[in-house]
């Protein structure tokens, strides 16, 4: 179990991030209520998640399906679980009825599998389209040029609802370097939103991580994905 000291540290970290979000919202003329702080809890033990839960977090993000499925029954039922990592089609069936939002849909084939499982389990699944705005070869995501067509194709599938876009910006020393990518994603969402496509909302932009979330908030992010800023450095040994 974590010590009380560690519980205090996690609560302090969580509240510091919330305060930074509040300030970024004020700078951008936004309400703090417009931004969800997603606690990225991958590789972290359940008791650390409970500490952050007690600090006020209700949205938690996991990268791996197995870890997500393992953690859900051990934690309070009012948590909203987000899958933010790359999703393989053969793992879809394990999570469609368990997650609040899938951030990482980047192909029609994946969306079709989500649709099949959603219909089978009689659930409605909310998704974001992952866009590789920075065109990094190491990252998943569709291109900005192909996003609208993908959105149109997925919008026709039963049981799947597009709620917006997600991007993973490059890891940079200066968060200002990523402002242009956040701006591009927001503009892409505006452009697609203006097309008024049935079964498509562009209300959620999932962008910004520990190193650059304040800039992302200033540029219109609705969900910031913060792991290290809350939990500290990840311990990858837990995943082996």
What spans do the regions from the language model cover?
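Gly/Pro- and small hydrophobic-enriched strand-loop and loop-to-helix capping segments
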Residues: 221-239
